[in-house]
């Protein structure tokens, strides 16, 4: 990861100014911190549970459960962070870093591919196929370097879009190569992914449209976040989203234990 990022920085540094490279690196860093934290937590919590389950049917159900919950958490986080990106950069880094916020809003879309990559990587790691895991990781790096070389003559925004496209192609490859081993087909994975992801996406657009009628500057992002959460929860309640209800039950149970 560090070597790959260094290659990106060198190539971008040769084509753009040092300030543009700084905005790119800062946007990437802001995307990486929350995304990797979520991925690490999910992998640490789910891997031993799934690996210790010997019944194939129960293991399949665990994969399905982890995939659904992971997708909901990640998609909600991604679109919430997109909603507050300007304010986050302004509050955490200062006004001079605001130009990095649009790059971050594109970069963070890469995180939407994490459920496919993490769950499918777990499938082959538990099966002990280290060669396939290594090849898929290498393919991911190659795809992103190719995307960078193709887009480097354009704008920084196009470079980041290229990285997002490469990440989605890589995620599709993970689903095609790994999921079929346990009957968790690519079609089924993306059907679940879309059925969950459209709600946070809709909540994001609704919150942005509502706030577009008001001029509140960076602080408007905070109201956008509130609208986003209200709309998302309302959509999930109206559609009786099973993943949302399950996560809500887990959260309420956890709070009750804390209050005892």
Where are these regions (language model features)?
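Short, small-residue-biased leader/transition segments that mark boundaries at the very start
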Residues: 1-3
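Interfacial/gating helices of multi-pass transporter permease domains
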Residues: 11-32, 61-62, 98-104
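Helix-loop junctions and terminal segments of transmembrane helices
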Residues: 27, 31-68, 121-126
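Membrane-water interface segments that mark the loop-to-transmembrane alpha-helix transition
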Residues: 56-77, 136, 191-196
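Short runs within selected transmembrane alpha-helices of multi-pass transporters and secretion channels
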Residues: 5, 28, 43, 102-148, ...
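Alpha-helical transmembrane segments of polytopic membrane transporters and translocases
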Residues: 8-10, 22-39, 68-69, 110, ...
């Amino acid at each position: 990861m560090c070597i790959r990022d260094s290659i990106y920085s060198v190539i971008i540094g040769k084509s753009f100014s040092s300030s543009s490279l700084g905005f790119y690196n800062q946007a990437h860093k802001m995307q990486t911190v929350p995304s990797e934290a979520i991925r690490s937590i999910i992998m640490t919590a789910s891997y031993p549970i799934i690996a210790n389950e010997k019944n194939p049917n129960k293991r399949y159900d665990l994969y399905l459960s982890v995939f659904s919950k992971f997708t909901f958490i990640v998609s909600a986080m991604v679109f919430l962070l997109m909603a507050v990106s300007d304010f986050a950069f302004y509050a955490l880094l200062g006004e001079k870093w605001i130009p990095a916020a649009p790059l971050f809003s594109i970069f963070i879309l890469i995180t939407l591919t994490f459920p496919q990559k993490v769950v499918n990587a777990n499938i082959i790691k538990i099966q002990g196929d280290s060669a396939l895991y290594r090849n898929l990781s290498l393919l991911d790096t190659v795809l992103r370097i190719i995307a960078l070389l193709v887009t480097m003559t354009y704008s920084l925004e196009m470079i980041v879009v290229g990285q997002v496209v490469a990440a989605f192609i890589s995620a599709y490859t993970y689903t095609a190569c790994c999921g079929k081993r346990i009957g968790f087909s690519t079609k089924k994975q993306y059907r679940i992914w879309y059925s969950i992801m459209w709600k946070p996406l809709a909540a994001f657009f609704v919150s942005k449209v509502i706030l577009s009628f008001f001029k509140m500057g960076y602080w408007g992002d905070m109201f956008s976040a509130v609208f986003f959460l209200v709309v998302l929860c309302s959509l999930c309640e109206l559609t009786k989203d099973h993943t949302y209800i399950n996560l809500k039950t887990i959260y309420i149970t956890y709070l009750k234990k804390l209050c005892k």
